[in-house]
Each structure stands twice: as structure tokens, then as C-alpha cells.
A protein has these predicted regions:
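Electropositive polyanion-binding surfaces
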Residues: 1-187
Length: 187
């Protein structure tokens, strides 16, 4: 399996990679980006649950501290441009003997920050493609009014408040996956 061998970033292994360097201004907007081929060596294998307690005590400017800072700045950038990211619960398969169970859990903040880094890289790549007049970009149009009306009805049926002054993007960001009635809004 490539993801566990030649294409993985296992600790102490040298692997070819595309390395992105993306500079941001103080509010998280991209000021420059470049990509280059390089050989990289991963120093350690991390997981979301393991780094979550470390982030709180991470030294300023460290990779983990920057993950939080940049993630939060990019979430604010997303909201400012009217973008939405659904607060989907994480799904995990639990195997006990011959029994398989699908379990759901609330996403950790670090998972959302990491997703913002991926989106940031995608935006940088898209800007390069637009500038170079190459590639195919996928964008989504605003939702149709009838789709928003259906969503209002669904929220009301689930007992989820949607104040009249709250915009569609703000509402989409508001469901709490920890509340039993809210996850169906993401489906």
C-alpha cells in the first residue's frame, strides 16, 4: 500500500515531495506562494489526539503553535469571504473480533486547523493555475434560493434555531456536532 510505504512520510525516512512555501500577512491572507520538488525527512509520526494537549504549551513560532495560529486565521478568512466548512463528525471503524462498528466523534480543533492548511495550499495552487492560464478549477455557485428555503424547513423540523438575520454561510458554520439534533443538518 503506497500510503504506508513509498508515498508515506514515516519517521526517519527520506521521501520525494512537493514542498509549498506560502507567506501570509498578519490576518492570514496569502502574500506569496511557491512550490518546489525536494527530498524531505519526517522527524516524527503525529496524530491529532496526541498533538492536541501539546498545542496548548507549544512554544511561540513552533510548528504546532503555527498550525493553530494559521488555522484560526484561515477560518476567519473563510468566514469573511462567505465560505463554509461543514462541522462534520469524524467517523472511525471500531473492530472487535468479528464485529465492526462505525463510531462518530466530534472533530478536534487541530483537525479543522489542518484542513485549513490543505485548503490554503489548494488556493495557492489555484492562483498559480489562473496566473499560468492552465488547469481546471472547480468552484461552487451560491445556493439556489429554493435550496436555502428547504434548509430553513429542515432546521425548523430538527428544532435548530436559524434567526432571520443569520446568513446561510453563518448558519452552516453554527451546528454543533455534539448535539444529537445537529449532525443531520450536515447530511
Amino acid at each position: 500500500v503506497l500510503s504506508e510505504g513509498a508515498a508515506s512520510l514515516l519517521p526517519d525516512q527520506v521521501r520525494p515531495a512537493f514542498v509549498w512555501t506560502i507567506s501570509l500577512d498578519p490576518i492570514g491572507a496569502v502574500t506569496s506562494a511557491r512550490v518546489e520538488r525536494a527530498l524531505v525527512r519526517s522527524r516524527q509520526r503525529l496524530d491529532y489526539a496526541g498533538v492536541t494537549p501539546e498545542i496548548e504549551h507549544a512554544p511561540e513560532g513552533s510548528t504546532l503553535a503555527l498550525l493553530q495560529t494559521i488555522g484560526e486565521l484561515r477560518i476567519a478568512q473563510e468566514a469573511a469571504r462567505g465560505g463554509v466548512s461543514l462541522p462534520m463528525p469524524a467517523q472511525e471503524v471500531d473492530v472487535e473480533g468479528d464485529t465492526w462498528r462505525l463510531e462518530f466523534r466530534e472533530m478536534l480543533p487541530v483537525e479543522n486547523w489542518n484542513a485549513q492548511i490543505s485548503l490554503l495550499t489548494g488556493f495557492a495552487a489555484a492562483s498559480m493555475m489562473v496566473y499560468g492560464r492552465i488547469g481546471v478549477l472547480r468552484t461552487l455557485p451560491p445556493p439556489a434560493p429554493e435550496a436555502v428555503t428547504r434548509l430553513h424547513r429542515t432546521a425548523r423540523a430538527l428544532g435548530i434555531a436559524w434567526p432571520a438575520e443569520q446568513t446561510y454561510p453563518d448558519f452552516i458554520r453554527s451546528p454543533d456536532p455534539a448535539k444529537p439534533s445537529h449532525p443531520p443538518m450536515a447530511v
